Amino acid sequence: MVVFQTLNGNDQPQTVSVEYQNEDWELPPVTSNPPPLPFPEDEQEAKKVTDANDLYDVSLASPVRCDLPLLQGGKVADEELSKHLQNYIGCLTRVWGPALQQAGYKAYQPKITVFPEGETVTTGCGTSKSQNAFYCGADQQLYIAQDILDVLSPDVDQARSVFDLIIAHEYGHAIQGRSGILGGKHVLESDLSKSEALELNRRNETQADCFAGAAMSSLWKGLNLTDQDREDIIKTTFEIGDDQLAERHNLPDTTGDHGTGANRRLWLERGLGAQTLGSCNTYTAPSGEVE
């Protein structure tokens, strides 16, 4: 429990206590060698882990401590960003680790690599260009280049929450990996048409948006997030929708693989208000909610 003082309406000190959760849970060290990911043996098992995962019955603890000041917005030195995000990943692990274990899965703390803008990074999944942030299932690590801000709207690229939101989304993919959802997706998509595979991928991405919202909700008090942060988080998620990116960067009007701005925002907000992770079950949602 943390006790601190605030001011009431009469500008008088008022003691407020916060009973943080998961305080006794032992945070695993950062690792570049996590346990292997679970992988379903057939389509029946794959459907079970995507559509009816044991994780969906679990609630994330809240509030969870995160003694970490947010960045002030915009680009910072790569070393500063790397230190901030690795500490933030520790907070996310304190949120997600007990939930994974409750559902019967193994928790770990992934490593973040911040690579220079304009350059490439070599990962277990191959080589990737900058203006990107991603989770690599082959090495179970997270990667980000600061010039990912260049693809965002000027309305949100200076928000102090932007890097934390992006990493919460990518950490959501790490949770999908550890819970077998990613493995299930890979099994299921092998026999799908192109349009069906795109929809399956959008289900996966919007679930990561929802997981990001749920985790940030758990960390809300610990990070001292505000109503303005909430507005920025919601707007940023909308701005990275397939349709919004296409319009802003004059890209061809094609079917996207991440979801429209409206649907990405929908699932983020569901995560922010989730009582259980079943609220993030995009795999059984109507197609219209994952367009």
Regions found by a protein language model. Give the residues of each.
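Post-HExxH zinc-binding segment in Zn-dependent metallohydrolases
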Residues: 194-220
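N-terminal low-structure segments adjacent to metalloprotease catalytic domains
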Residues: 1-60
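Pan-zinc metallopeptidase signature
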Residues: 244-291
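Short pre-active-site segment immediately N-terminal to the catalytic Zn-binding motif
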Residues: 148-166, 196-200
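Post-HEXXH active-site segment of zinc metalloproteases
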Residues: 179-202
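Active-site recognition of the HExxH zinc-binding catalytic motif
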Residues: 96, 161-181, 208-209, 213
